[in-house]
């Protein structure tokens, strides 16, 4: 599931842009819920370099792999919109994890 702070119209436009018909997309993620997921919150600065109007406040990217028991297997939390994991890399990693029964790491905190 992909979640966005964007409204339905803008979220739908992004889904069409990526060309996927198989992704489930949630929208209107509120800032308090984003904070619960430990996402970084940024203040909008008007139009981006590609002409998109930023929200007043919005969460920076996060990617969470959640196990069937609803615990986190892996989390990628970013403070900038750059160096996001590519979906093909995530899929390849998931295939490896499933095939090799690779355990979660970072569990000794």
Where are these regions (language model features)?
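Chalcogenol-based redox active-site neighborhoods
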Residues: 1-109
């Amino acid at each position: 599931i992909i979640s966005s702070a964007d409204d339905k119209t803008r979220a739908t436009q992004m889904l069409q842009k990526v060309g996927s018909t198989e992704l489930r997309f949630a929208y209107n993620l509120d800032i308090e819920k984003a904070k619960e997921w430990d996402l970084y919150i940024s203040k909008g600065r008007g139009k981006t370099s590609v002409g998109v109007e930023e929200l007043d406040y919005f969460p920076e990217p996060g990617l969470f792999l959640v196990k069937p028991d609803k615990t986190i297997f892996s989390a990628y939390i970013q403070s900038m919109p750059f160096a996001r994991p590519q979906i093909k890399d995530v899929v390849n990693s998931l295939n490896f994890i499933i095939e090799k029964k690779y355990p979660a790491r970072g569990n000794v905190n």
